[in-house]
Amino acid sequence: MGPERHLSGAPARMATVVLGGDTMGPERIFPNQTEELGHQGPSEGTGDWSSEEPEEEQEETGSGPAGYSYQPLNQDPEQEEVELAPVGDGDVVADIQDRIQALGLHLPDPPLESEDEDEEGATALNNHSSIPMDPEHVELVKRTMAGVSLPAPGVPAWAREISDAQWEDVVQKALQARQASPAWK
């Protein structure tokens, strides 16, 4: 018995359970009866686990107890692809929900979609420079920002040399130039 074995003597194996053609993530592998009884020798058809490349006999897939079949997991994360079920396929969605419940997981309900939120979101995406606010909120923001002062080391020298009126003129010209030029999206 070498370092390739678990303390119990059973070989360590990772696999993907394939049920009806659907591939799931790493799942528990149900031990066979000899492993449950604490049999120390290797089981028929199983090899020692090691970090080396899998042998040909380990790559073969076969049917196990209760119709389960085993498929080795992909060890290269860059090649891993996730297939998403089509939104309209109710059977697949129901199957996924059943699996989530069987695993004891709870996912929060999706937020309710509202037409008002969609319109506001579309408007905000089209016009990045404005946030819809009522006049009272605008005044509150102005009063709050008027009270903000930056520490002297935080203000660059060029900003100390320009007056507020000159700065407003620079900002207005920049805004007009941005509105006149085509968007670079």
From Swiss-Prot:
Pfam families: MEA1. One of its GO terms (cellular component) is cytoplasm. The keyword Phosphoprotein applies. It comes from the Eukaryota. Keywords: Developmental protein, Differentiation, Phosphoprotein, Spermatogenesis. May play an important role in spermatogenesis and/or testis development. This is Male-enhanced antigen 1. The lineage of its organism: Eukaryota, Metazoa, Chordata, Craniata, Vertebrata. The gene is MEA1.
